[in-house]
């Protein structure tokens, strides 16, 4: 939309009706007039025709839309204008720079009471309820003669929004000179008093100067120390230098969420750190403080009661729920006590229940122990040391020390004989197997690794087996001979017996052959597998005669690397 031809507003037409004759009426624009106006508008946009000018002589941009350039009908504009779109600053000029007089108007003295004036002082500028003077013994209304000054009145009709709220309106900065002069007089009096003190006591100067430094420290409120309802927000914002912000505990964006509005972090920012070592473990504990647990217990009781047919609700009837809960707890305690008394009456043992409360059992004792500087007991009896629940100083199998008194190369043993087998018999002091090798040099260890490995990786020889072809031929020849014997009729009885014997022998030989075949298959499998897998310590039998040899330095180092940290015996001393 572009700026179009100006239309005469309705208000202008109504106002100009009286000036025009009755015969003159506003003419309707013809098609030719609309075409000319359109051509003029296009020419102004193209720059071939001069732009329209407002009442102040400024050009109007032809590209301004019509809904902006056209003034509303109630504005009363006669020609093209943009005045309705610009702020009118001349109307906003007020009396900020003009100093309206304040206080009493001393130029005029009033001696008689006027109607509608203040009944107390006689000023016409305020009423009795707004009078700031003390109540007079004889009010101005009833006094014969008065002396009063009226106050200066500000013309509020010409006061705008800012002037009405200007606290420094009609303030004279020269009045501040009186305050400065008053302070100067006080300082001069202080200097005179100090000079008199110095004359009387010259040594008082040092103590006075030392005291002046901390003279007003107690009167100043340090940040974070004053507790006031109006200042709690500022105190809450303070934080000591050593304190670390919650959102700086863990800079990982996927860690615990920090809510900046409430300044809270519920979850633990470092869940991997143990709770006893963590400085900050989240603020979830606050959710379970106060009456939270009691509220949760009441809610649970309400649900259970509603499930059993009692019409009660925590939010709708809190008082009823509380009374029901108290009654339930009382009946529960009565039932427990009645059950207890019934059991005591039946089985006895009431004297064991008559014990003083736990708070008095360990609160105070008559035992007195006095120690010397070296830690020895001078007076009293020393408290017995806490003993283990396990048997102590029990020596078995001729040992003079307990199991675990000796440790070497990651193994525990007996110190008396340096044995690493727990149920071994003590044979006196001797070096354990592999102890000297562990402390030998790396060169000797490297030299001994190859033959040791070769000896460990020896594969047991398999004895020669009987070929299966011979067994098959023997088994096939036996039934053929038995068939030939059956032909003869005179040997029928002996044939039956011999048949049974042969069948038994044949079954026995087949069982033996199956066992041998199974052994050969197992041995072939072990040959095909890697040699270290055959020597795997985890797959051997518990009571096997396994050849134990001292590990080399490389094996010990590899074992120490793979050993978990919890198995380290020196972990508790770190």
UniProtKB/Swiss-Prot annotation:
Residues 16-45, 87-100, 510-540 have a biased composition (Basic and acidic residues). It comes from the Eukaryota. A zinc finger (CCHC-type) spans 116-133. Residues 1-14 have a biased composition (Polar residues). The modification Phosphotyrosine is found at residue 216. Keywords: Cytoplasm, Metal-binding, mRNA processing, mRNA splicing, Nucleus, Phosphoprotein, Spliceosome, Zinc, Zinc-finger. Residues 441-456, 470-480 have a biased composition (Low complexity). GO terms for biological process: mRNA 3'-splice site recognition; mRNA splicing, via spliceosome; RNA splicing. GO terms for molecular function: pre-mRNA 3'-splice site binding; zinc ion binding. Its main location: nucleus. GO terms for cellular component: cytoplasm; nuclear speck; spliceosomal complex. Residues 490-509 have a biased composition (Basic residues). InterPro entries: Slu7_dom, Splicing_factor_SLU7. Residues 1-64, 78-100, 252-274, 433-574 are annotated as: Disordered. It is found in: Nucleus; Nucleus speckle; Cytoplasm. The modification Phosphoserine is found at residue 207. PANTHER family: PRE-MRNA-SPLICING FACTOR SLU7, STEP II SPLICING FACTOR SLU7. Required for pre-mRNA splicing as component of the spliceosome. Participates in the second catalytic step of pre-mRNA splicing, when the free hydroxyl group of exon I attacks the 3'-splice site to generate spliced mRNA and the excised lariat intron. Required for holding exon 1 properly in the spliceosome and for correct AG identification when more than one possible AG exists in 3'-splicing site region. May be involved in the activation of proximal AG. Probably also involved in alternative splicing regulation. Component of pre-catalytic, catalytic and post-catalytic spliceosomes. Associates with the spliceosome prior to recognition of the 3'-splice site for step II, probably during catalysis of step I. Belongs to the SLU7 family. This is Pre-mRNA-splicing factor Slu7. It comes from Drosophila melanogaster (Fruit fly). The gene is Slu7.
């Amino acid at each position: 939309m572009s700026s179009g031809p100006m239309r005469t507003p309705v208000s202008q037409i109504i106002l100009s009706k009286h000036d025009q004759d009755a015969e003159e009426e506003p003419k309707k624009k013809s098609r030719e007039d609309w075409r000319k106006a359109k051509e003029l508008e296009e020419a102004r946009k193209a720059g071939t025709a001069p732009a329209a000018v407002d009442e102040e002589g400024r050009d109007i941009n032809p590209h301004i839309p019509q809904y902006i350039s056209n003034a509303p009908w109630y504005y009363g504009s006669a020609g093209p204008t943009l005045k309705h779109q610009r702020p009118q600053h001349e109307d906003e000029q007020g009396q900020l720079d003009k100093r309206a007089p304040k206080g009493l108007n001393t130029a005029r003295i009033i001696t008689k009471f006027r109607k509608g004036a203040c009944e107390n002082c006689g000023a016409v500028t305020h009423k009795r309820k707004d009078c700031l003077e003390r109540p007079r013994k004889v009010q101005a209304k009833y006094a014969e003669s008065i002396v009063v000054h009226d106050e200066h009145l500000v013309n509020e009709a010409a006061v705008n929004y800012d002037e009405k709220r200007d606290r420094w309106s009609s303030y004279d900065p020269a009045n501040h000179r009186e305050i400065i002069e008053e302070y100067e007089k006080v300082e001069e009096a202080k200097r005179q008093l100090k000079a008199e003190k110095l004359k009387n006591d010259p040594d008082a100067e040092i103590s006075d100067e030392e005291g002046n430094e901390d003279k007003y420290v107690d009167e100043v409120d340090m940040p974070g120390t004053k507790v006031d309802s109006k200042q709690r927000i500022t105190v809450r914002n303070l934080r000591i230098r050593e304190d670390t912000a919650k959102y700086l505990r863990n800079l990982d964006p996927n860690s615990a969420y920090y809510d900046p509005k409430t300044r809270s972090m519920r979850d633990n920012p470092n869940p991997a750190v143990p709770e006893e070592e963590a400085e900050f473990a989240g603020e979830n504990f606050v959710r379970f403080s106060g009456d939270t647990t009691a509220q949760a217990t009441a809610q649970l009781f309400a649900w259970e009661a509603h499930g059993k047919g009692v019409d009660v609700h925590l939010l709708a009837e809190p008082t009823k729920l509380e009374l029901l809960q108290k009654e339930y707890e009382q009946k529960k305690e009565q039932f427990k006590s009645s059950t207890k008394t019934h059991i005591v009456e039946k089985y006895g043992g009431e004297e064991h229940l008559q014990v003083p409360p736990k708070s008095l059992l360990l609160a105070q004792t008559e035992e007195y122990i006095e120690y010397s500087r070296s830690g020895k007991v001078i007076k009293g009896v020393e408290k017995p040391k806490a003993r283990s629940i396990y048997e102590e100083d029990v020596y078995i199998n001729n040992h003079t020390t307990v199991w675990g008194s000796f440790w070497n190369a990651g193994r525990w043993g007996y110190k008396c004989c340096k044995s690493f087998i727990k149920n071994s018999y003590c044979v006196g002091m001797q070096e354990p197997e592999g102890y000297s090798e562990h402390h030998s040099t790396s060169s000797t260890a490297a030299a001994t690794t190859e033959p040791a490995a070769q000896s460990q990786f020896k594969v047991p020889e398999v004895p020669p087996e009987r070929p299966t072809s011979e067994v098959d031929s023997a088994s096939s020849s036996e039934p053929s001979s038995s068939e030939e014997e059956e032909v003869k009729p005179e040997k029928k009885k002996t044939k039956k017996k011999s048949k049974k014997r042969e069948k038994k022998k044949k079954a026995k030989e087949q069982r033996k052959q199956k066992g041998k075949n199974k052994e050969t298959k197992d041995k072939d499998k072990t040959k095909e597998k890697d040699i270290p897998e055959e020597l795997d310590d985890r797959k051997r039998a518990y009571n096997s005669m396994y050849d134990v040899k001292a590990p080399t330095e490389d094996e010990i180092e590899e074992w120490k690397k793979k050993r978990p940290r919890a198995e380290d015996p020196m972990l508790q001393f770190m």
